[in-house]
């Protein structure tokens, strides 16, 4: 029954991937920044969600890409995390000291806990990691932040992307995942980082593959970002945190959740 419900969305995504292999369509749908825009990028703060660039050499419609899409959509369908529901509390491994903890162990009192799931081979995630660091610095006084390293989005022995920051094969053991997470640590040295277990318990509970954002507060899911790449938006999370901060400062204010 689940397969029947999932198939229309999967088929639509498959057709989209097939169309994106035609470069004329790809160039229209995935716009690249112009030279003028790139030159003016240094003026003012950079955007929270820089555009995702897909090189012409990348094949979008392959057996491996279809496997990855099906896997991600299946995890999203069966996830247990939903806005307003109790937050799943799977086991993770803290990168520092390799101590086994649970997601909610990183929460502190009534402060929101921001979860950012992703991997080093996910171009949108890595492109927005700097934005996430800025966000964490802006709201460190009211919220806590946790990066969770999950299975690779574009492993070198799977759906390969030439735009990936690193060439990393599928994790065969926990040490593989911990080594990959060390690379992410280099890009976000000031943010707590944990890795998913080898049975991908966190990714499954939160439907996190390819990448995803969540806000947990008092053991409840308060915000659930869309599935990456298209639904992965740091700007949307910033809006939620801005509204939350306004509510803290003005208890009578009306807050519209994103």
Swiss-Prot record:
Which residue ranges does UniProt annotate as crossing the membrane?
A: 1-20
Quote the PROSITE patterns the UniProt record gives: T4_DEIODINASE (PS01205)
- Name the active site residues: 122
Principal localization? membrane
Q: Which Gene3D superfamilies match?
A: Glutaredoxin
Tell me the function of this protein. Answer: Plays a crucial role in the metabolism of thyroid hormones (TH) and has specific roles in TH activation and inactivation by deiodination. Catalyzes the deiodination of L-thyroxine (T4) to 3,3',5'-triiodothyronine (rT3) and 3,5,3'-triiodothyronine (T3) to 3,3'-diiodothyronine (3,3'-T2) via inner-ring deiodination (IRD). Catalyzes the deiodination of rT3 to 3',5'-diiodothyronine (3',5'-T2), 3,3'-T2 to 3'-monoiodothyronine (3'-T1) and 3,5-diiodothyronine (3,5-T2) to 3-monoiodothyronine (3-T1) via IRD. Catalyzes the deiodination of 3-T1 to L-thyronine (T0) via outer-ring deiodination (ORD).
Protein's name in the database: Thyroxine 5-deiodinase
What's the name of its gene? DIO3
């Amino acid at each position: 029954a689940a397969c029947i419900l999932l198939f229309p969305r999967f088929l639509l995504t498959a057709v989209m991937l097939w169309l994106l292999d035609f470069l004329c369509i790809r160039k229209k749908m995935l716009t690249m920044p112009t030279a003028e825009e790139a030159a003016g990028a240094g003026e003012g703060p950079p955007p929270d969600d820089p555009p995702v660039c897909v090189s012409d050499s990348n094949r979008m419609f392959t057996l491996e890409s279809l496997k990855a899409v099906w896997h991600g959509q299946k995890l999203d369908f069966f996830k247990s995390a939903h806005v307003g529901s109790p937050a799943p509390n799977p086991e993770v491994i803290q990168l520092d000291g390799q101590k086994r903890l649970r997601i909610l162990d990183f929460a502190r009192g009534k402060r929101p806990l921001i979860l950012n799931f992703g991997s080093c081979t996910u171009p949108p995630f890595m492109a927005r990691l700097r934005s996430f660091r800025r966000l964490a610095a802006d709201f460190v006084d009211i919220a806590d932040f946790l990066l969770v390293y999950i299975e690779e989005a574009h492993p070198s022995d799977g759906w390969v992307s030439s735009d990936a920051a690193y060439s990393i094969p599928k994790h065969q053991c926990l040490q593989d995942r911990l080594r990959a997470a060390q690379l992410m640590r280099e890009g976000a040295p000031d943010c707590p980082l944990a890795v998913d277990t080898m049975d991908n318990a966190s990714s499954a509970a939160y439907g996190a593959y390819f990448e995803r954002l969540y806000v947990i507060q008092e053991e409840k899911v308060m915000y659930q970002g869309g599935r990456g790449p298209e639904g992965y938006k740091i700007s949307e999370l910033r809006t939620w945190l801005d509204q939350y901060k306004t509510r803290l400062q003005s208890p009578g204010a009306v807050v519209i959740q994103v």
